[in-house]
Amino acid sequence: MEKLVTQQVQNVDPKQSEILNISEIPAENPTETPIISKQKLLEAGVYFGHKASQWHPKMAQFLLKKKRNETHIIDVLKTQKMLEIAYKLVEKFAQKGAKFIFVGTKKQAKKVIEEQAVRTNSIYVSGRWLGGTLTNNRTILSRLKTMENLEKQAAENFQGYTKKEKLAKQKQLAKLQKNLNGIKGLKDVPLFSLIMLVADPLKDAIAVKEARKKGIKIIGITDSNVDPSLVDFGIPANDDSTKSITLIFTVLADAIASAKGGKKLFAYQSDENIILPEDPEKELKQTRYRSNSFEKFARQKNTLKDSQVLKPNTEIQA
């Protein structure tokens, strides 16, 4: 049986550490396969930060000191370590019966949020976050009831209604499904058992604020421009790349699946078994100012050795 030891995560607020019971995370075994290899993290572009002028000072401990083209570079070793801790936290919560709400309304996150939430039988929001989803639960549950009634009527082809009435009801149902399909399960889940997994705490600030108000724990990606105290546990990484978000959220979903005896897709798998999506051309153009300087630097060195690009990680001490 895996031995549990008390560990201290230096870069996590003590209150957050207590909330998430980080002290009960299994000890690291250096001989084990890494949760995701450094090379695969680099391939996913998790290290791309924002322009230095946009940074948040609380993220300094996760960034390399040297900037390229005035752009911050996230320390991949720290991303790797924090992702592994997040995995173990999510797995532990899932084993204890927690339910999860995946949140990612930006274009780069939508697909993976939906896919991994459905895969793990979780709740999700990939479209517009409806204000009051968590804080005005009664209204949301009422809308869900309306949607269920309309779906029953639709199954009977809206029998008894005129053609005009049918069309109106079909439009109403389509709108409700677009906004509420992902949170159907919310009516069966007590809020105190929810854990929020969020792709971008800034983009989905309303969701984060509501979760905070209801005491829901939050685990999310924290890019170089994000205040890490917005979440209970942050994974320092690029939140503007489809590859980066897909990698991280598939790993988090793996933790839920593993807790239920399911298959892991990315976590602790060999690189050749991890197939990442191609980033859209528009997305590549948007992040080019962040990537060009680092890639040029890597080519000049003709290597991605830790000693040249990455600082040693001292995140966790047994």
UniProtKB/Swiss-Prot annotation:
Give the top-rank taxon of the lineage listed in the UniProt record for this protein: Bacteria
Q: Name one GO molecular function term.
A: structural constituent of ribosome
Q: Which UniProt keywords apply?
A: Ribonucleoprotein, Ribosomal protein
- Does the keyword Ribonucleoprotein belong to this entry? yes
> What SUPFAM superfamilies does UniProt report for this protein, alphabetically?
Ribosomal protein S2
Q: Which GO terms describe its cellular component?
A: cytosolic small ribosomal subunit
Q: Which Pfam families match?
A: Ribosomal_S2 (PF00318)
Residues annotated as signal peptide: none
The reply to whether Membrane figures as a keyword in the UniProt entry is no
Q: Which GO terms describe its biological process?
A: translation
Can you tell me which family this protein belongs to? Belongs to the universal ribosomal protein uS2 family.
Q: Which PANTHER family match?
A: 30S RIBOSOMAL PROTEIN S2 PROKARYOTIC AND ORGANELLAR, SMALL RIBOSOMAL SUBUNIT PROTEIN US2M
> Under which name does UniProt file this protein?
Small ribosomal subunit protein uS2
